[in-house]
Each structure stands twice: as C-alpha cells, then as structure tokens.
Amino acid sequence: MSSIVNRASSASLPNFLAWRALGFRTICSGRLGFAPSVPDSPVSAGTKILESFKEEFEVGSRVVSFETGKIARFANGSVVLGMDETKVLSTVTCAKTDSPRDFLPLTVDYQEKQYAQGLIPNTYMRREGAPKERELLCGRLIDRPIRPLFPTGFYHEVQIMASVLSSDGKQDPDILAANASSAALMLSDVPWGGPIGVIRIGRICGQFVVNPTMDELSSSDLNLIYACTRDKTMMIDVQSREISEKDLAAALRLAHPEAVKYLDPQIRLAEKAGKQKKEYKLSMLSDKTLEKVADLAATRIESVFTDPSYGKFERGEALDNIGKDVRKVFEEEGDQESLSILPKAVDTVRKKVVRSRMISDGFRVDGRHVDEVRPIYCESHYLPALHGSALFSRGDTQVLCTVTLGAPAEAQSLDSLVGPPKKRFMLHYSFPPYCTNEVGKRGGLNRREVGHGTLAEKALLAVLPPEEAFPYTIRINSEVMSSDGSTSMASVCGGSMALMDAGIPLRAHVAGVSVGLITDVDPSSGEIKDYRIVTDILGLEDHLGDMDFKIAGTRDGVTAIQLDIKPAGIPLDIVCESLENAREARLQILDHMERNINSPRGQDGAYSPRLATLKYSNDSLRTLIGPMGVLKRKIEVETGARLSIDNGTLTIVAKNQDVMEKAQEQVDFIIGRELVVGGVYKGTVSSIKEYGAFVEFPGGQQGLLHMSELSHEPVSKVSDVLDIGQCITTMCIETDVRGNIKLSRKALLPKPKRKPASDAGKDPVMKESSTVYIENSSVGEIVASMPSIVTPLQKSRLSVPAVVIRTAVECNEAEKSSPVNDNDKPRRAATSKPDRKPKSTASKLIATQKEEEALESIAPEETSAECGEILKQDGKLKSVSPKNNSTASNLVSFSKAKKSTMKENLSENKAEESASVSTRKLKIGTEMTATVDHVRALGLVLDLGGEIRGMYIFQGDKDKFKKGDTLRVKCTSFNTKGVPVMALVDEEGEE
C-alpha cells in the first residue's frame, strides 16, 4: 500500500466521488499509473509460426478459395473451402495397416452443426444427435465420385470428414464439401487418382445458371450436380421438372468446363503444401492364379451364362458350385496364397466371360438383347383398405408401394442449414433381407435405403400438384418384395401408380429404368475400344458392368437422374447417348402403367379412408383443443380419427366414412360450424320474440330468423309457426362484421305458383286467386238480376252476410284493375271496429267456408249464357251484355276450386294448432312415446311428435339405442333453452 501512495501523490489522487466516476476498469487499466503497460515480447527462437497456404479463383461469378495449414494440422490432409460467407472443412485420415478384405473401406461423414448459422439445437440435450437424412445424402454425394479413383487393390481404411464451419444460407454446402474433400485427398499421402471438380447447374427462364443460390434454385426447373476429372465424367445427380434429353445434354456439356476450373487450384495447392504419396501394399491378383482359375472354370461359367433358362438363384447356385470345385483343386495343391484371393479371382473370371460375350454377340445372361426390357406386370388398388396401393414387377424385381395421406401438420420437419423447413412428400424405401433370401437385421437409417428412397422421391416430386391445390402430407412406402436389379426405378413406377390409386391428381405417370455399360478397354492406352449400352440391367449386370445410370421421367422429359460408375470415369458422349436409350425403354414401361391406371381413382365404398379439411377461427380452434389439448385427444381416443390443426385449418383423417362422421359430429358439438352465407344448417329454436325467433346451432352459435323469413305467406304471430325446442332447417342469408347471423326458412320452401299464361285475357277483377267483396245491400239486386238461375232457397242463402278474407296485395291489384273512380269505391258491409284480438286461423277458414257454401248453391248446370258480368258502377250493381257473361261461371268455378284447397288448409292448420297447443301444455311429469331421431355423442335427440324435439342424456347406456327406436319417456325438466329433458320409463311406470 505504501508503494501505491509513493507512486501517486496526494495532489494527483482524486476524491471519493471522482473514483466512482472513473470506475474500476479505468483505474486498473493503468491510466492512473497503477498498472504499467507491458511491452509485447518478441517471438523467441524455436517457436513455430503457423504457416497457411491459400488458392483463390473464380467460378460462376463467385470467388472460391482453398486454404490449408491453419486448422486441423494433425490430419493427413485438411482443407477449408470458402465461398462468400460459407466455409467447409474437410479432413482425410488413413489407417497405417490393412486387414484382409476384398473391398475399399471408405467412410465419408458429412456434418452440419447449428453453430454454423448461430443457433442452439432445439433438442432436449441441446446437442446434435444421430446423422440426419440430409447428412447421409451429402456423404453419399461426396463418396460416389471419389471412390472409383482409388487404385485397384488398395484396401486400407480411409475416412473423410466434412464439417460446415459457417453458412450464410445462400449456397448449399454439399458442393463445397465435395470439392474440399478432393483437395484434402490431394494434400494427403493417400494414393488417389484425382483431383475432381464438382459443380451445380440450374436453369431459370430457359437460361443456365452456374452455382445458383438457394433462392435461385427455388425458381429453377433444373438442379444438376456434375463431377468430373479433366476429361471423364465421374458422377451425375439431377432433379428437374420434365426437362428434355436434348436440354439435359446441353446442361451436361456446359457443366464439364465449369467443373474443370476446380482442378488447377487443387494441383497448385498440393504442390505448395502436399505430402509425398506413400507406398502402400496393394492386394493384387497374380497372373498365374488368374490363368489357372480361368482354365478350371471359364468354360463352365460360360455355359451357365449362355443358358437363359437359369433364374437368379439357380444361376447363383451353379456359379457357387463352380467356385467350390475350384477351391478343392487349390486345397489339394496346398496353394495357400491363392486360396486367400480365390473368391476375387473367380469373380474376375466371371466378369471377363460375361463382358466378352456381350461385346461380341450382344446377348445377355438371361437371353435378352442389350436394348430389351424385361416382362412387366403391374396392379393398382392391390390393398383396397389403404389410401392407395400398387404392385409393380419387372422380371424378378418386385416392389409393393403404398400411399398414406395425412394432415398438413404431419409434414416432416427439416433441421438443416439450407432449404425448406418442412417436407410434405416423403418416399421411404425399404430393402428387407428376405427380398434376396438372406438372413439379416433391421436397424436404423441405412445409407443405401435413404439414397434409393430420395432418388425415387425426386422423380415423383415433379408431377405432384402444388401445395395450394393439394395441401395434404403424402407418404409412400416402397417395400422391396424381391430384388434382381433396379429396385429404385421399380419404386418410381409403383409409387406413381399408387399415387394415382390414392386419387392424387398427378400431372402424368413417371417411370424409371436403369441403363448399364459394358466396355472393352485397351490395356496399353486405357482407351475404350468398344462398348455396349445395356437397358434394364439385372443385379448381376450391375455388379459386373461399368455403369449404373438410373433415369426417371414422364413422356415429356426427365425428372431425376443418378449416375454411378466403377472405372475411373467414362466419356460424356457415352452418357448423352445413354439418355436416348433410356427414353425408349421408359415409354414402353409407361404404356404398361397407363393401361392399368391412367387417371386418379375416386373414392369408392364406405370403408375407404377419408380425409377432410375444415376452416375455423382461431378462437374456435382454441376451444376445440381445450386445456392442455384434453378435448382434442378425447375426440381422437373416442372416434379413432386423427385431428391436426395448422394455421386456422382443422384436418381430420379417418379410416372410413363412419369414423369421419363421428369425429365431425363431436367437433360440431364442441365448437359448431362456421356459418357461411348460402349454407343450410339444422338448429333448435331457443327463444321466440315478437319480431322473430332465435335459432341455436351446435357450439352455441345463434342466428335471428325474422318473421318475414318464416314463410312466403304473411305470418302475424311467430308462435303460430314455431315453438321453443323445435328443430328446424334454415339457410344463412347474411352475416355482418359484428358476427350477427341472419337466417331464412322461406328460402328453403317452394315458392307459390304464379298465374298461368292462359289467364292473361281474363278480366283482372275476377282472378281465380282473388275474392270479390259483396255489400249486404246489393245481395238482393244480384238475385233480382239473375231470375232465371236463382231459386228462392238460393236467394235466402245469398242474403246471409259473407266475410271473405284476402291479402292487401290482392286488394290493391283489384282496385287498380277496376274501371271505377277512386271516389266511387264501395264500402265494406261490416263497418264496426274489429276486435283487438285477432281471430284464429280456424275461425277465419270457417267464415270463408260459409261463403263457399253460399256461392256453391248456384248450380253450374243452371248457368246460362244470358247471365252478364256484374260490375260496380255508381255504387250500384247492374248486368252487362251477354257478350261478356263469364261472371257467374267464373264465380262458381272459383268457389269449387277454392273449396278443396281451404279444406286441406283447415285440416293442416287444425293439426298444427293442436300440436302447438299440446307442446305449450307439456308439463313436467307428462309421459309419452318418443322416437329416436339422432344418436349423439352425449345423448339422444327424441322426436316427440309435431316437429318437437326433446333430449335424453346417456346414463352409461350409449350402446343400447339406435336411430328409429321407440321409447316410453317422461318429461323431467326443461333446459335453459326451453328444450324438454326426458327420462326413460319402464313398463311399470318407474324411471
């Protein structure tokens, strides 16, 4: 402390407030003299400075850089490749010793960690888990062009690990990882015949784009990945939207020189920082051993391959017997060195025999020509209980494809650095051991299965309807039943048929075929002297050949391609020639598929799976989900359906129509339906007002049914038509911004018949649909004017005052059509004030019936032509000329026609009135017989008669009832909406 005081005098020390203002960081930083600065120490002798090497170049208007020496220095070879803000590290390591094997144990691991885009993994442990599908696919993408360039007989274990260090989301890191792996192999001491260049080509609006960004790829109809050496093609991977073979060949020829731009920077970097290649022991076959095996087995092998009657397993068994006989000979001679490589030697002899016969004769092991397709059998709708299914066979290769539709929320979530966040179409390829008659284990993700499934998925993705038109999640399962080559292309064919069988509107069928290559190479120069392109290869031809070129597409173009080769590259001209051979074979396969099913199949039967999409508001969906999702899970458990909610849409997936109806019924019971203008809905009358009635729908929604919308006829009182608790069907005619719903009942009723065109010439006063008002004082004049047709008894009947009711519209029409002046209108006979209480419908009809009886007393047979038409003029009635004498006849015919109609109306109104009266008089304790109208999830809807509905709540006896059952019930209470609640009554009258 004393030293501090000596170094800082009292004059220079600030006061307490100044200390606080300066802060701890300022004090300890040495600004006040407490912490003297320490000069940078020079680099001591012997300290190794990190030395890095870098190569930069430009490809497709973007700067690419290779860098080594800064990180991962202990690896046999390590390179960081950068493009924009995306950087990928690739490392190579190799085992020092090899183990006895006859293949190259090359492992390629590609990894994307979330730190590369500044995120923490959204997992429970917040760590990256097992490799994802995309990581496996990128590993295969790196492996396929690299593997053929290792020397023959090099069986040391090699591991390549590619890791994404940072990603800006603009470029897909897979291409960068492949080029970085090539550069890392060039820097290592591992013998390898590289380098290679890998490029991506897109096509936007007909123009090819080199190294397109992810945004550009979304609008591109081509995604081509091309790998090559300086003059040979190594690998092709294509996903496109029906691109023609001509345009695809043009894209390949453009990609080759662009990919070559990656080669020279790798060579320059290897010259600066590369290691000397080591001498590794190669497991080579001696010429002496090969000659001896050929002498013992070549003739017998050729006889097996030239016999087309052999099947796959018969041929394999015959070849195994030949190998066993050769082994016995070597064991008798005691040649242990040859015994260790004998399987490889026998396989080499097989390859020479098959290849030489196909090159010279053009025939294959099963007797086909090089361009011939195996027999095809296909069957759609193989499993009717599924959404879609198809069985496809080509030769001995057979696959079973099934389609399952799901809700949009069931789409697969993709946790990758680039690309879409979800995938709604999935094809899962499965290769079980029994398909090759082998014993094996079923594990997790298999790289081969993932790769084959993704290839078939890309082939079918181009013909699927857009998500806006078909938003459902689609899953295809491709189960290989038997395998003899090209199972992935068979999955494309079977998957296309299964999609059609599921009713999905595909744009066209997609078929796939594998094309192989057999070459005759000059040993001295390594150039190809002769070759044969083989269509629809067998599994044996895939093993013994040089190329497996899988091509899928429609009649209009290619949708997916995958090229794998075994030699160190093939010329691009041969690749382009293979495209035309594949197109011809593809058209043959499409013919077979279209003969079986050529359009989407419609739903058939009540047992086929169902899928429905319903739109609801967010508030309604929250009600459906319930607290912690209880209500949603309850519906799924009780009905067996699956409910999915996504962005205001409810999707219901059910096994059959019955399950779908049960699920929709429970959904409607909880949240009701979103009423749409023009929609017809059933509801219950909850309350009656003077101006109308309120109708309640499932879910608690209510709408107003105004009295003007009850019927086409005028309604003076709503209760005369409706009762509380009555179940009615209405149409939604209007909804406003506040959510108020207006309903109509008359919109569903038939409109009244209009006047026929034949009545246009009749007098408008005497319409059939109208009634004439007759004054009491004029009755005698009417009788006096018709002495020839009216008897004294009839006169007495006509003297009775008649009260006839007609509508205001009919009165107005009669007054407008009448020739009298407005001042000369006759007065009504009854001038007294009407009663305050309106008369009932029955009393009105009785008064009308009395008038009919008075008018009917005029016998129609006594009517003569001398009876003139009665018109009102100057307040008096007088007869007119017989030329227009249709008044009496019209009056009589009208009365007879009206009589039957009014009698029917009288009986109907009496029934309605009695029904409504009985409903209003329904009291607690009233017993009656009811019929089960509907069976709901929580109870029964009972028909009590007279269009009156009641309810019965289940008491653990849900399964005892069905629609149409007759029950004896008693009214126990009324709910808040006025609906009677009933209880069951047994035969002894007890509840």
UniProtKB/Swiss-Prot annotation:
Residues 609-667 form the KH domain. Residues 822-838 have a biased composition (Basic and acidic residues). It is found in: Mitochondrion. The keyword Hydrolase applies. Residues 1-39 form a transit peptide. Keywords: Exonuclease, Hydrolase, Mitochondrion, mRNA processing, Nuclease, Nucleotidyltransferase, Repeat, RNA-binding, rRNA processing, Transferase, Transit peptide, tRNA processing. GO terms for cellular component: mitochondrion. This is Polyribonucleotide nucleotidyltransferase 2, mitochondrial. It catalyses: RNA(n+1) + phosphate = RNA(n) + a ribonucleoside 5'-diphosphate. GO terms for biological process: mitochondrial RNA catabolic process; mitochondrial RNA processing; mRNA catabolic process; mRNA processing; rRNA processing; tRNA processing. InterPro entries: ExoRNase_PH_dom1, ExoRNase_PH_dom2, ExoRNase_PH_dom2_sf, KH_dom_type_1_sf, NA-bd_OB-fold, PNPase, PNPase/RNase_PH_dom_sf, PNPase_PH_RNA-bd_bac/org-type. Belongs to the polyribonucleotide nucleotidyltransferase family. The keyword rRNA-binding does not apply. Coiled coil: none annotated. It comes from Arabidopsis thaliana (Mouse-ear cress). PROSITE patterns: S1. Involved in the 3'-end maturation of mitochondrial mRNAs, rRNAs and tRNAs. Functions as a poly(A) mRNA 3'-5' degrading phosphorylase and is required for the degradation of highly expressed transcripts of non-coding regions. Disulfide bonds: none annotated. Gene3D superfamilies: GHMP Kinase, N-terminal domain, K Homology domain, type 1, Nucleic acid-binding proteins. Its EC number is 2.7.7.8. The gene is PNP2. Residues 813-865 are annotated as: Disordered. GO terms for molecular function: 3'-5'-RNA exonuclease activity; polyribonucleotide nucleotidyltransferase activity; RNA binding. Plants silencing PNP2 stop growing after two to three weeks.
